[in-house]
Amino acid sequence: MLSPKRTKFRRPHRGHRRGRALRGNTIAFGDFAIQALESSWVTSRQIEAARRAMTRYARRGGKIWIRIFPDKAITMRPAETRMGSGKGSPEYWVAVVKAQKILFEMKGVPETIARASMRIACFKMPMKTRILQR
């Protein structure tokens, strides 16, 4: 699963999930792409599940580009802990995805296989998505 090697700060603020992506919202590498239609956090597990689904359906054919990276640590407190005593420890990593951001791209496979594999990957995502073609 994806995670940064090192970060400047261990425990970032949660931030706001509003607005749309001003960069990374066009197809750059492949012929087909998955585009987010809503803002959301995508965990490294969800990214890996979508990548695996796409590569398995395409039978390791073609090339896949992952256009997002989980660089935000999400902290959690232990169960049944009293309030106070600081912020929790980092548990998992998420990519902050805004609406219209391209998540995955694919090239080198027929259109039917590309669309079918991307449709499976879309079900792994926590937001509404659509499939684009160059």
UniProtKB/Swiss-Prot annotation:
CDD domains assigned to the protein according to its UniProt record, in alphabetical order: Ribosomal_L16_L10e (cd01433)
GO biological process, one term: mitochondrial translation
One Gene Ontology term, aspect cellular component: mitochondrial large ribosomal subunit
The entry's keywords: Chloroplast, Plastid, Ribonucleoprotein, Ribosomal protein
Pfam families: Ribosomal_L16
Alphabetical list of InterPro entries matching this protein: Ribosomal_uL16 (IPR047873), Ribosomal_uL16_bact-type (IPR000114), Ribosomal_uL16_CS (IPR020798), Ribosomal_uL16_dom (IPR016180), Ribosomal_uL16_sf (IPR036920)
Annotated compartments: Plastid, Chloroplast
Primary localization: plastid
Cleavable signal peptide: none
GO molecular function: rRNA binding; structural constituent of ribosome
Family (UniProt): Belongs to the universal ribosomal protein uL16 family.
Description of how the protein assembles with itself and partners: Part of the 50S ribosomal subunit.
Protein name, per record: Large ribosomal subunit protein uL16c
